[in-house]
């Protein structure tokens, strides 16, 4: 068969005319090295800081180091099978996580994917993990309380909605227990809770989930998990992901509470990433921006005003303020609060609850040290009744600590000193509280009233706990309506004072404990 050159050229021209190519601009690069979860990529000339880079098998890395001839990125997840020469590409997107009410009651990972085996999550949308905090004009002062249910905290170190209150102490001093009890106490308050577990054992997290479920608080809580077995990248990003989920409620005129357990482990994960990326180390080998790591996170916890909420919701929600309260946890080594990360977070937050191992081992639980625990803004948010009745507690404890130190060397003490020591011991005993047993405002008011007006003076020290249990049972049984109203209003006036006086007089006259 002989081919005609004219026919061939016509056929080629026809094919060329019919050929339609769709041009697609793709910013691609090649992996040049993989080590310890860090990949170096050649190419990607248009990549952004913090951009998600698409890897093979539907995985992602986050661009952190933008250098002259390469990009340093941290892999989100397993990296064992990544190899030199693999092609990657830019996505043009910053990391986002799902947000919405569908996350309540669920356990998710850093990327918002469910890990509790309860099926898909119906989210209301996505939110970037890194968001600029509300400005000065958009904020409102803190004047509403967050009740922890702990007498020692609500009376001496009150927390307000929109506040950042640090929980700091050595390992095994009850930091997580305080945070979990605070979540349990919110189940009827309308405050949505987010618990971010960073670098913890999976068994510990499972225990927390079980306790919240047993106490009926899981339905009101989102649990974000970056366990010890997760990559450093996911541990570093977990607090930001949890914060984005909490901001969903804050920006819609609702109240949310977020607990970061704990930011020491997040700082260690960030240090690991920074050293692997060959960033210059500073004090304690942390990178230079470790302060910014925590400040940009904790500044997002705020109380925002009505205009902010109205503008954000485009007029759907009017006349409501929103808040995100943060309780970051920091673990100290041998009580050293002057280390790098603890001092940073103390300077960022609005106060700290310092839990002391000596007090914890002595049986004072919660082991709050009233001397160096402080709340810088919570006083304005404290309920009126607790504020009025708890005024003398901190002073009594301070005087007791001072006198107790001298009393060790003095053999004979005068009556006034003995009385003060006895009062201090009884106040310390009264502030002790069991785990998973938060008290209402009214119950705290009854006990504080008993301390303030000397109803404990004739009660033996070893009988204080029994006295407390029997008194609360009596008050709730005989004055249920009054206790309910006092918890709701938190008010204090002559009428309430007389009622409290009547409860205690009747109780002491008719009850044994």
UniProtKB/Swiss-Prot annotation:
The keyword Oxidoreductase does not apply. Keywords: ATP synthesis, ATP-binding, Cell inner membrane, Cell membrane, CF(1), Hydrogen ion transport, Ion transport, Membrane, Nucleotide-binding, Translocase, Transport. Signal peptide: none annotated. Pfam families: ATP-synt_ab, ATP-synt_ab_C, ATP-synt_ab_N. GO terms for cellular component: plasma membrane; proton-transporting ATP synthase complex. ATP binds at residues 169-176. The record marks 373 as: Required for activity. It is a peripheral membrane protein. CDD domains: ATP-synt_F1_alpha_C, ATP-synt_F1_alpha_N, F1-ATPase_alpha_CD. One of its GO terms (molecular function) is proton-transporting ATP synthase activity, rotational mechanism. Produces ATP from ADP in the presence of a proton gradient across the membrane. The alpha chain is a regulatory subunit. NCBIfam families: atpA, PRK13343.1. This is ATP synthase subunit alpha.
